[in-house]
Swiss-Prot record:
InterPro entries: Integrase-like_N, TACO1_YebC-like_2nd/3rd_dom, TACO1_YebC_N, Transcrip_reg_TACO1-like, Transcrip_reg_TACO1-like_dom3, YebC-like
Keyword flag Transmembrane helix: no
GO cellular component, one term: cytosol
Any single biological process term in GO: regulation of DNA-templated transcription
Family to which the UniProt record says this protein belongs: Belongs to the TACO1 family.
Location within or outside the cell: Cytoplasm
Name the UniProt record assigns to this protein: Probable transcriptional regulatory protein CT1665
Keyword annotations: Cytoplasm, DNA-binding, Transcription, Transcription regulation
Principal place of residence: cytoplasm
Domain of life, source organism: Bacteria
Length: 251
């Protein structure tokens, strides 16, 4: 299984046991607000907002919450002004980590991130220190039960499919150029094919395989970062063997 597929599997299992819906809603509200501020409140002409709304609805966010977040972004309602800041650094075992934040207090956020990284066996680096190791891509998960690999590839080739990962037991992972994420989603919707977790992802060019101890530390660090109120997303180039993954799943 590829490093990206393993990480996707771990993330799904984390999400299945994560009860912090309030924290998730906070992050989604920030993303909707920022998207509306940057590109306007009409999702038909704002792909980032459309994706944020789709993600919020997939996570059962009430429409009233979504509309209020949009209006805060467009200035129709008063609210906090968020600044997007990306931090880069290294984690246990030398893995590269990218941390995307949305904050109304830059000083608070950088202090929190630095503390979490230091406590978790990592360190903050300068801007650009690890970003060059990743490429921004569109990512969609399609249940294997919904369609065959050949049919999925045929369906999406003209829509913008770049790569189809098929080594996960439950899901195909569709990777696209960022600009082709919406056309690929539309092709799936029009064909009646269910999908999950449509998002913009950061895919590493290469992975760093960790032993059990460092993998455990890295997962704990990433979990702590993701639970920070100001953190929107965390990406890494962590990989692990099937045996290490099995050990961690049993814990």
């Amino acid at each position: 299984m590829s490093g990206h597929s393993k990480w996707a599997t771990i993330k799904r299992k984390k999400a299945a046991t994560d009860q912090k819906r309030g924290s998730l809603f906070t992050k989604l509200v920030k993303e909707i607000t920022i998207a509306a501020k940057m590109g306007g409140g009409d999702p038909t002409g704002n792909p980032r907002l459309r994706l944020a709304i789709d993600t919020a609805r997939a996570n059962s966010m009430p429409m009233d919450n979504i509309q209020r977040a949009i209006k805060r972004g467009t200035g129709e309602l008063e609210g906090a002004t968020y600044e997007e800041i990306t931090y880069e650094g290294y984690g246990p075992g030398g893995i590269a980590i990218i941390i995307e934040t949305a904050t109304d207090n830059r000083n608070r956020t950088v202090a929190d991130i630095r503390h979490l990284m230091s406590r978790g066996g990592g360190s903050l680096g300068e801007s650009g220190s690890v970003g060059w190791m990743f490429k921004r891509k569109g990512s969609i998960e399609v249940p294997r039960s919904a369609i065959s690999e050949d049919d999925l590839m045929e369906l999406l080739l003209d829509a913008g499919l770049e790569e189809l990962e098929s080594d996960d037991e439950q899901y195909f992972t569709v990777l696209t150029d960022v600009k082709d994420l919406e056309p690929v989603k539309k092709a799936l919707e029009e064909a009646g094919i269910p999908f999950e977790n449509a998002k913009i992802d950061m895919i590493p060019d290469n992975y760093v395989e960790l032993d059990v101890e460092n993998a455990r530390k890295a997962l704990k660090l990433i979990d702590a970062l993701e639970n920070s109120d100001d953190v929107q997303a965390v990406y890494s180039n962590m990989d692990m063997s099937e045996s290490v993954m099995s050990v961690l799943e049993e814990e």
